[in-house]
Amino acid sequence: MDDLTAQALKDFTARYCDAWHEEHKSWPLSEELYGVPSPCIISTTEDAVYWQPQPFTGEQNVNAVERAFDIVIQPTIHTFYTTQFAGDMHAQFGDIKLTLLQTWSEDDFRRVQENLIGHLVTQKRLKLPPTLFIATLEEELEVISVCNLSGEVCKETLGTRKRTHLAPNLAEFLNQLKPLL
């Protein structure tokens, strides 16, 4: 596990939860995750769940993705998706508004790995350098990804070679995020 990335993710999650507490006097609330089982759920309303991060349980790697492509995945990606269970968190990096993707449960972790594999299949078919997404943007064809060759974080337009460098590594990217509520 990459300790710098794990700590940066935990620190951002704490900043996000603290901002939510300050604004709403509660743990984060999600309507999107209502009805989806998770160890993160503290309580449920009639159409939403309150959640708090929980330690990840299970194997702390995305080896299924590695096996599917017979490649080595950046250690930061293993760490990013297996440090904790949490809800997705809205954030800002510079002037970019994003939703930082998180693993909600063990079932969700399997789905995340399947989505990462699908993403890599498309990139391989289009002969694009491999990236692994970590966040979504309002523009549906853009994501924030980690380049699997360099470990750099970039904004990428799906299905194209268009990439904008954002940070030299995932820990630095996470450390620069500001919570958005």
Curated annotation (Swiss-Prot):
<comment type="similarity">
    <text>Belongs to the Syd family.</text>
</comment>
<dbReference type="GO" id="GO:0009898">
    <property type="term" value="C:cytoplasmic side of plasma membrane"/>
</dbReference>
<comment type="function">
    <text>Interacts with the SecY protein in vivo. May bind preferentially to an uncomplexed state of SecY, thus functioning either as a chelating agent for excess SecY in the cell or as a regulatory factor that negatively controls the translocase function.</text>
</comment>
<keyword id="KW-0997">Cell inner membrane</keyword>
<keyword id="KW-1003">Cell membrane</keyword>
<dbReference type="InterPro" id="IPR009948">
    <property type="entry name" value="Syd"/>
</dbReference>
<dbReference type="InterPro" id="IPR038228">
    <property type="entry name" value="Syd_sf"/>
</dbReference>
<keyword id="KW-0472">Membrane</keyword>
<dbReference type="Pfam" id="PF07348">
    <property type="entry name" value="Syd"/>
</dbReference>
<protein>
    <recommendedName>
        <fullName>Protein Syd</fullName>
    </recommendedName>
</protein>
